[in-house]
Amino acid sequence: MAISTFKRKIASVRVSVASPEIIRAWSSGEVKKPETINYRSFKPERDGLFCEKIFGPTKDYECACGKYKGKKYEGTVCERCGVRVESKEARRKKMGHIELAAPVVHVWYLKSSPSILSTLLNIPARDLENIVYHGSRRIIERSYIITDSKKTQFAAGDVLYETEYEVYKKVLDFDAEIAVTVKNPKSPVVSDIDGEVSIKSEQTNTGREIIWITVKDSKKIPIQLQPGMILLSKNGQEVKEGTILVPEKQIAPFYAPFDGTVEIDEIASTLTIKPLTTSKEQPVTVTIPYCVRVLVKNGSKVKAADELLSGGTIPAITSPASGKVVFGKELNVRPLEDDTYEVLSAGMLYVEQLIQEKRYPIFEGSLPYVNDGDKVKAGDYLADRFLFEDEVLSAHEYKIFEDYYPQQFTVEAEVENDRPIVAVTEIDDELSKETGLSVGSIITESEYEAYKELYPGKIEAHYGAAAVKKLLEKIDLEKLKAQIESELSQLPRSSGKALKLLKRLKIVKNLIKSGTKPEWMVLEAVPVIPPELRPMIQIDGGRFATTDLNDLYRRVINRNNRLRRLLDLNAPDIIVRNEKRMLQESVDSLIYNGRIGKAVADRNGRALKSLTDLVKGKKGRFRRNLLGKRVDYSGRAVIVVGPDLKIHQCGLPKKMAMELFRPFVLAQLLKEGGESSKTARKMKKAIIEKEMPEAWDILEEVIKGHPVLLNRAPTLHRMSIQAFEPKLIEGNAIQLHPLVCPPFNADFDGDQMAVHVPLSAAAQAEAKYLMLSRYNIISPAHGKPISMPGKDIIVGVYYLTAIGKDFDDVKTEEIRYRFGSTEEAILAYSLGYVDLHTPVLAKVKVSDQEKIVKTTVGRIIFNEIILPDLRDYTRVFGKKEIKNLIYDTFKRHGIDATADLLDDMKDLGFHYATVSGLTISLKDLIVSPKKDEIIRGAEQRVEQVEEEYRRGFLTFDERYREIIKIWNKATEDVQFVTQQALGENPFNPIFMMVNSGARGNIDQVKQLAGMRGLMADPSGKTIEIPIISNFREGLTSMEFFISTHGARKGAADTALRTSSAGYLTRRLVDVAQSIVITTTDCGTHEGLKAVELISDDLTVQKLKDFLFGRVLSRDVVDPLTGEVIKNPVTGREYVRNAMLSDEDAEFLAEYVVSVPVSVEQVLDLQGLQLPHCYAEVCEEIRTVDGVYYEEGTELNWDVVRNAKNAGKKQLKIKMYPVVGTISEQVIKDKKGEKELVVLREEIDELTAKILEENGVSQIKVRPNIYVRSVLTCEAEKGVCAMCYGMDLSNHKVVNVGEAVGIIAAQSIGEPGTQLTMRTFHTGGIATTADITQGLPRAEELFEARKKLKEPEGIFSTETGFVKDIKEVEGRQKIYIEDYSGGIHEYEVPEKTKVKVRIGQKVLPGTPLTTGAIRLRKLMDTLGVEATAMYLLKETQKVYVEQGVEIHNKHFEIIIKQMLGRVEIVDPGDTDFLPGQLMTISEAEKINEKILRENANAQSNRNFVLGKILAKKVVAKVSDEVEEIASEGTEVTEEILEKAVESGVKEICIYDEGKQITYQIAPKEPMRYRRRLLRITKASLEQKGWLSAASFQQTPQVLTEAAVEGSIDLLEGLKENVIVGQLVPAGTGLETFANIQIEETPRAAEAEKMA
């Protein structure tokens, strides 16, 4: 039956942002409850995360309640339980959703770097996050306290923060003072002195109370006052010392006014006259003044006018001291009219002399502990505090307390507050102008409250995802685009602001292009993935284990339900706000746990795996499941050697084969029985299971010609999977042919291999004809054999073809045995007349000729298996000779002959290795007698050096270097004499092993039987004490200790290498995977100049190796004749597009001719043919119309035409045949000081003239050879077959469809493990730095590291001569003189050494010093080709140093990917950003398209007239973004003119019902420059998002791709593996899609054979 292999099913994959509608459309129901399953019945809970109604039934075709069972009810929805009857597979596909009670921002868009939402909304990421998470902004601001509220609603003492104050102050009239906040007031208030307390209170300017507590300490001087005295001072009045308190007073005598009786009261000091009873007078009382005598006695009777009191004087009283007047408590006074007092009774007056007084203000609310008049002691408490913590004081109040309590409290003039922030979502235009706020401005909540109060209804602000959503809904993308574009047109493109705008513009354009609404980045509903993808499993002990996702979903549902409940209850805002934040956080951790804040963890502290974790990283969906797919039909087993197999066979254990081929056996059994019923199947299965004999017979039949694939992990290159024909064997191990071990890197010490069975006919055909091991003998990495005999086979062949020590001494005539044919010789051997190594003469046939040769029977036996034209009876065959023999066989006779030769060689080798009886014993290790003498000599020389050092003739470093040198020489000498001693007996087993190349090398023999030599210490520095012993003699303990460093380092190295090498391979594969041969010939004439690769005087690659396997891009011309070169042996002409084999490469590499520098000639202008080389005119030419050519003008057709016009018949010319050739010798000037031409320099006309001036007539040169290379290929995708050249695995031109990128990556990555990690030390000398080698160097180059491990070297940028090298101000400088005499100065960097000498000729790129060259610098100064060649040379060097051979083309593919991008410098009118990267071909195409469309702009304008607009036209007109025309408008001349004037370049119209964009004004093309990318960056820069996402930074790549609505056209290999299609390479290409494959029945096949 004819079947077509495949048709491509999926053409492209698009990723975009899902709208809430789409999320709901995906869903089959809303998940409302966090429950999963009922723990009693184990049934899913209704409306829970495993609900059957939403996700489908748990049992096939059965509803939840069991009412409907069976497939016949499919599609029925059960009315009882609501479950739809369908296959349980639905639970893998059906999704649910959670309706969110509040919108939630998708964390990918919020926290991508740079944040997409932040860029789009033009809000700083920190602020945006704070809005989303209901956060706050830390604000440091002043506060104000109101002192006079005037007519506002404020009260005195209200506090306003600066932000609100500014808002209110603009509109309202009130007075306020700057406020301060009190911090750390000391308490309680303590009296500092003894004294008396007085208390009073007062009000401050903010209307608050201050209580003043005063404590006085004083001394009182008492003054006795007597009645009648007049007191001049008031109570409390301050008086000075000597002030008159009581004035002097004259008192007149007192006479009785009438007759009466006298009563004297001595206590009251009064005198009373009582009248007679008959008199009408009233009694009179007078005070007896101080210092007056009473002249009468108490009770005596007196007559009127009797003198009662004598007169006298009251003396004046002055103040004894300065102080305050204080009235005593018993002092009784009467105020008089003139502000004085009359003393009524005796009492005390005090002058209080104040010693000290202290006042203590305390603020309202503080509690005083004392009362007025209390006496206190120092240290007594007066009040609990004077101020409260965080009390806000006006400046005035602060001043009071600062004066009275210095340093007892601190204040903060600015308050640091975390203020909740909101985003403005709507604002009135006038208010916006007035306040400077706009939609999207972030303000604090208090500011918002102020604005809302002052401008009700004119401003709206929100927080949380709702705010972001509102802001996103407000965005008019078209308008925003026009606005950004007009802003950009006024900025320099490289400015920071412009770059920010460009990033924003890119997002806006991407959203427009993909048709995504910005608000979709905020989730209204969260999709719930199918339950089977997040299963719950019962584990032992009845508990359930669940996927982390269920926990994360549960948190979301719980918080969502709680928020819904709070909203229904109208809970306080602060609670709702907190719940919204928690909901946002729970959705974040569901999508990307740990991206924001601390990751949600389980009870063991392990972070839960969120949806993002399922996608990203090595264990994510991409790398684990999509790219790391498992292969069906496979078994694995240990491998053992199968020495009797053919190279294309493998031994398959019977049991394993039966298991693998079971379906085939079953089918065959059924076919033979001709039945297919269920019972028949059962019976036949039983036959197989019981292993009946007929099952084995059929297995034998089925297996015939059915190849199997064997794979050994790690699969480092394509040779790690090969096809074999299986042979059934007993036992449980797979038998493997010994010769296929090298490609698999397998050995038989317990390695395992996997077996895969190709099932379809197409797969079998591929395995048989492409993957069979006999077709994989040649390595695609270098084109040489890889399936090579090793170890014992080599020893066997070597033993067979080896000769005794005296073979060469035996003369022909002395030889006893002479044979007429090879058969005779072999017969004589088998009969025991001669042994293998006896010299014999035999008649042999070599390439169709018979001749007699002196040989041995062993050599005759070996040559029997070789094809006649390759036989050689005169040499011994070691590893190298065998490799060459295999390679020559392949080149001359093809792969099949090679495979047969290998098989024969294996049989011979094993047989004769056994016959040879190879063993090793200690006796075989022969220690040379000369060893001791060499060591003694070295020790003496070391002693001399030490002596010189002691005398001070040598520095420490010089001594160290000398000693190392001496011991290195001694070690070499010992090695040489050891080798000699061993070679005495050619059949010494160790000598045979080493000499044949089977195992070990002379270095190891030196350590076994010579001396171990010098060792390195852990830092890599050489230890100067050598190990003099060898292992045969045994080491001393000191020597043993010194040896351990290296051993440990080796072990550590190996472990580190493997992982680094694996990662390097992965990056290489990633960067090159999309390079496939897409076409036979791209037609380019570009190419690389073939050169020898030389780095630091080490020939990294010979010219012939550079040429091998290449295609010529130009004819190779003989410098002398100008004709195409022809190979005299093969007759091949080396014209353009000829592919070079080994022989061709060798011939061209050695093609050197001696050419004259210049030749003078007369050119006949009649029979015209221009010379084949560069030539100049030797005379002046003047034409009639004034054209003039001076002597020395280059000859070309213009010159010839004008010479003819000038009437010339002949023209004197000078030809320079050397120009354009490659010099093969160094030529110096006459003095021998200056190099005129260096080796391998391309000679230009200037150089040729310099040679001529210096009298050089002839020079040896080789032709310039240009080969095609992938670096210069112009194929649109991938590369073309001609530029790639030879497929190294079969030496033919590569096939279209070959995945050369992956082969390149494998070829470079596979030997990675062999590369050392070490950074070698150059004998511990400080001046030259460590040389980075091996893997780190390879990585440094591929990753184009900016930071180099070794110091940076410098290179020449000119062609010229080294004029001078000298030290200027402590820095070494190199001066180079160019051809025109200009001098260029180069400063030698520190830690590097000069590599050039005076008089040396340098070319651009010649390194002037040691050290690594910075790739980007090289690229900027010398361009792409020089960089590519440097990279090629340096990467090759890393591998060559380790003895690894890899063809250049593999490196070139990687380098092509590193250099294949351009960076946009100025995007012109394209949608790209400066700094964006794209491939060269894309950039060229875009510019071509722009130029093409610019030509059509005018005709497009005519075409669109009268058509209907599909999208509105928006542009910035005089500072305002205006709509020029709305959607659905007819296009008119006016609209077009206005649009073009405003800078609109294209419009979108309806044309025949479709939306088509037409360009209506010329656009600016973009400018770009080549960029060098490191391989990781190059991988991420790939076009398709699938490939980039599966490489690194998965979430970031997917986020950007979704916003862009990116479409992956599945061009690379990875993308197709991910979607599960055949890869577009090899037989997966469209070209092979229609091949018809027919499966011929076995019987018919057998008939044909017969």
UniProtKB/Swiss-Prot annotation:
Keywords: DNA-directed RNA polymerase, Magnesium, Metal-binding, Nucleotidyltransferase, Transcription, Transferase, Zinc. One of its GO terms (biological process) is DNA-templated transcription. The gene is rpoC. The lineage of its organism: Bacteria, Thermotogati, Thermotogota, Thermotogae, Thermotogales. GO terms for molecular function: DNA binding; DNA-directed RNA polymerase activity; magnesium ion binding; zinc ion binding. InterPro entries: DNA-dir_RpoC_beta_prime (IPR045867), DNA-dir_RpoC_beta_prime_bact (IPR012754), RNA_pol_asu (IPR000722), RNA_pol_N (IPR006592), RNA_pol_Rpb1_1 (IPR007080), RNA_pol_Rpb1_3 (IPR007066), RNA_pol_Rpb1_3_sf (IPR042102), RNA_pol_Rpb1_4 (IPR007083). This is DNA-directed RNA polymerase subunit beta'. It is an enzyme of class 2 (transferase). Its EC number is 2.7.7.6. DNA-dependent RNA polymerase catalyzes the transcription of DNA into RNA using the four ribonucleoside triphosphates as substrates. It comes from Pseudothermotoga lettingae (strain ATCC BAA-301 / DSM 14385 / NBRC 107922 / TMO) (Thermotoga lettingae). SUPFAM superfamilies: beta and beta-prime subunits of DNA dependent RNA-polymerase. Binds 1 Mg(2+) ion per subunit. Its cofactor is Mg(2+); Zn(2+).
